[in-house]
């Protein structure tokens, strides 16, 4: 493992996504926002299609990527320019931070080589959270950045905004202004995860009235530990559309793995701090203390973690409610805290010390992701007393965090059949004051190990439509093993699909733009445009070429599904062409009210074509 930097540099994927180029849109205050532009064939006569881009500099051919140096500190000048932070020595890194407790110190990895900066924190009496700024009426560069990002595609539509959907009471604007972003953050309906010690991150918003976001989970375990693979999975996941990444490492080298990821991540990074705290006490939940947990929070905040999953809603009186469940407590963090509560027969230190946790969060602008430690792990346990009791507590904790101007989102289930999904969204909105909801799926059935990315994407699309702000991906390995690089891509693309489907259903103003562009390309047999406009151009072209690999097939007016004689779109075009020869618009011809005349006209077409049922493909 000592050769980790070289291996990491070799494995990270860079370069543009097929058919795309990186562009930057500049705002009035000089904020430059990265986007992806998909060029279409000149024959289409259509302008390029711009899409939201999470991939950072890794897809920019003009960027110099050096994993050992990390990414440029995009936000550092913004952070320092506000004048409310100070640098300080920070806590010393200890062997137990990397799970190297005891005499055996073997198995470590090379630390990130460029950790020379001193961490930042709020000056005494200051609060550096985006919510605090928003509530003071300040529009930060982060808010302006978010507004420009969220408007991608809307300028192209101009006054033809496509508002066709049901948003269930959301307040999605036609055009996102920095003022709108500020107001949503101030109300707690959106968060901008942006730790002041993660200046490499590109600002993004998680909220019901913005585009639905997705999260990808990575991280090593006690069974499989490879820092190079985790850094590569982070870069790979954002290439395909992950808006945030959670490092759920539980084995050795947790601190160093996280440092490599953070310094090279252009998206917010989340963690579950109790995992590392548990490693520090040798995996014995009963030995956890507030002091160890607090030290872990500060350690991770100094590194730059943008949001913490904290299972403060697992209360002692709720634990007996899970006794009759089919699958009990399935959350790792939830089970750890449940065991601690039972061993000490008292409320957890996460719950009792919540105000003190808020003080740490606002000193670094770390957002809460209040964990659903009692989420259902099977559809049999969905929407039960334990789940909703915890949800009510999370709503109470949200109000406490908001008193500190700390950003909050709420984690949700889990395993929920389709007919019970909307109740989860409705109860969360009511209990948690419209704080952003962040759900794992939910999985809509329990019978598909190996296909749980599909069972969960069904639920994810639904709950995203109902109002969930961010969807946590599920890979094909869910319940079976640690996902590899290929699993990560499948999970991300599947969830990008679910999130986009939700945006369409909500009536997001620009969501249909890409769909319509691809549909026109499909009808006009512009194969390369079809590939490039898709969520996964590589796989789309690969599937096409499995049966029609010749270069000429990229211009053919048919595919291998129907062949040249049965292509419905080709036949439709022939009908339109025939209508044009009759000096009538195609829609008028096809929609003619006189059925008899229409049938006679089609009879004429048949005879003019030689009376053959099947026709050869046009040259």
From Swiss-Prot:
Enzyme Commission (EC) number: 4.1.99.17
Free-text function comment from the UniProt entry: Catalyzes the synthesis of the hydroxymethylpyrimidine phosphate (HMP-P) moiety of thiamine from aminoimidazole ribotide (AIR) in a radical S-adenosyl-L-methionine (SAM)-dependent reaction.
Gene Ontology process terms (BP): thiamine biosynthetic process; thiamine diphosphate biosynthetic process
Sorted UniProt keywords: 4Fe-4S, Iron, Iron-sulfur, Lyase, Metal-binding, S-adenosyl-L-methionine, Thiamine biosynthesis, Zinc
Keyword check for Membrane: no
UniProt-recorded name of the protein: Phosphomethylpyrimidine synthase
NCBIfam families per the UniProt record, alphabetical: PRK09284.1 (NF006763), PRK13352.1 (NF009895), thiC (TIGR00190)
Required cofactor names: [4Fe-4S] cluster
Gene: thiC
GO MF terms, alphabetically ordered: 4 iron, 4 sulfur cluster binding; carbon-carbon lyase activity; zinc ion binding
Keyword Ribonucleoprotein: no
Assigned protein family: Belongs to the ThiC family.
Gene Ontology CC terms, in alphabetical order: cytosol
Compositional bias (Basic and acidic residues): 93-104
Pathway(s) per entry: Cofactor biosynthesis; thiamine diphosphate biosynthesis
Subunit structure: Homodimer.
Chain sites annotated for binding substrate: 217, 246, 275, 311, 331-333, 372-375, 411, 438
Annotated transmembrane regions: none
Organism (species): Rhizorhabdus wittichii (strain DSM 6014 / CCUG 31198 / JCM 15750 / NBRC 105917 / EY 4224 / RW1) (Sphingomonas wittichii)
Organism lineage: Bacteria, Pseudomonadati, Pseudomonadota, Alphaproteobacteria, Sphingomonadales
A Pfam family assignment: ThiC-associated
Renumbered residue ranges of the record's region Disordered: 93-114
Reaction equations catalysed: 5-amino-1-(5-phospho-beta-D-ribosyl)imidazole + S-adenosyl-L-methionine = 4-amino-2-methyl-5-(phosphooxymethyl)pyrimidine + CO + 5'-deoxyadenosine + formate + L-methionine + 3 H(+)
Binding site for Zn(2+): 415, 479
Residues annotated to bind [4Fe-4S] cluster: 559, 562, 567
Leader peptide range in chain numbering: none
């Amino acid at each position: 493992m000592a050769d980790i930097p070289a291996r990491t540099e070799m494995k990270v994927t860079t370069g543009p996504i097929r058919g795309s180029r990186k562009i930057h849109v500049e705002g009035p205050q000089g904020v430059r926002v990265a986007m992806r532009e998909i060029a279409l064939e000149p024959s289409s006569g259509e302008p390029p299609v711009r899409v939201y881009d999470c991939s950072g500099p890794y897809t920019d051919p003009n960027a110099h990527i050096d994993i050992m140096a990390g990414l440029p500190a995009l936000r550092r000048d913004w952070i320092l320019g506000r004048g409310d932070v100070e640098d300080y020595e920070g806590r010393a890194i200890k062997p137990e931070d990397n799970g190297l407790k005891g005499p055996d110190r073997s198995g470590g990895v090379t630390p990130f080589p460029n950790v020379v900066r001193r961490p930042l924190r709020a000056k005494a009496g200051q609060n550096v959270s985006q919510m605090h700024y928003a509530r003071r009426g300040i529009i930060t560069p982060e808010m302006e950045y978010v507004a420009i990002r969220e408007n991608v595609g809307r300028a192209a539509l101009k006054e033809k905004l496509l508002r066709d959907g049901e948003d269930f009471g959301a307040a999605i604007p036609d055009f996102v202004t920095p003022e709108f972003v500020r107001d949503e953050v101030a109300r707690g309906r959106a968060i901008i995860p942006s730790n002041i010690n993660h200046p490499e991150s590109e600002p993004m918003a998680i909220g019901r009235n913005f585009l639905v976001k997705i999260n990808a989970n990575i991280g090593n375990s006690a069974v499989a530990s490879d820092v190079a693979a985790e850094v590569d999975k982070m870069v790979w996941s954002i290439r395909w559309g992950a808006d945030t990444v959670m490092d759920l490492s539980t084995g050795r080298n947790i601190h160093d793995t996280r440092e490599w990821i953070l310094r090279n991540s252009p998206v917010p990074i989340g963690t579950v701090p109790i995992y590392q705290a548990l490693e520090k006490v040798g995996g014995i939940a009963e030995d956890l203390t507030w002091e160890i947990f607090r030290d872990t929070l500060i350690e991770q905040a100094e590194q730059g973690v943008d949001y913490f999953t904290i299972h403060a809603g697992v209360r002692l009186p709720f634990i007996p409610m899970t006794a009759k469940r089919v699958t009990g407590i399935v959350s790792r963090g939830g089970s750890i805290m449940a065991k601690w509560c039972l061993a000490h027969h008292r409320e957890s230190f996460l719950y009792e010390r919540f105000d003190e946790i808020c003080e740490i969060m606002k000193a670094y602008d770390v957002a809460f992701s209040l964990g659903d430690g009692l989420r259902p792990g099977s559809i049999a346990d969905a929407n039960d007393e334990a789940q909703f009791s915890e949800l009510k507590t999370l709503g109470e904790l949200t109000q406490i965090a908001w008193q500190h101007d700390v950003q909050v989102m709420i984690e949700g289930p889990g395993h929920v059949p389709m007919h019970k999904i909307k109740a989860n969204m409705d109860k969360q909105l009511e209990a948690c004051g419209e704080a952003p909801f962040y759900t794992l799926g939910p999985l809509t059935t329990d019978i598909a190990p190996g296909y749980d990315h599909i069972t969960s994407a069904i639920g994810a699309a639904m709950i995203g439509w109902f109002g969930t702000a961010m969807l946590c991906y599920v890979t094909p390995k869910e319940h079976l093993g640690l996902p590899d690089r290929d699993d990560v891509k499948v999970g991300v693309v599947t969830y990008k699909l679910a999130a986009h489907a939700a945006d369409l259903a909500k009536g997001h103003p620009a969501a249909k733009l890409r769909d319509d562009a691809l549909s026109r390309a499909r009808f006009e047999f512009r194969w390369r445009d079809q590939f490039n406009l898709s969520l996964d151009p590589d796989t789309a072209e690969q599937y096409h070429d499995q049966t029609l690999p010749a270069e000429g097939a990229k211009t053919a007016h048919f595919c291998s599904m129907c062949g040249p004689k049965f292509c419905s779109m080709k036949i439709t075009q022939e009908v339109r062409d025939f209508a044009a020869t009759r000096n009538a618009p195609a829609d008028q011809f096809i929609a003619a009210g006189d059925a008899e005349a229409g049938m006679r006209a089609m009879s004429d077409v048949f005879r003019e074509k030689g009376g053959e049922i099947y026709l050869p493909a046009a040259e």
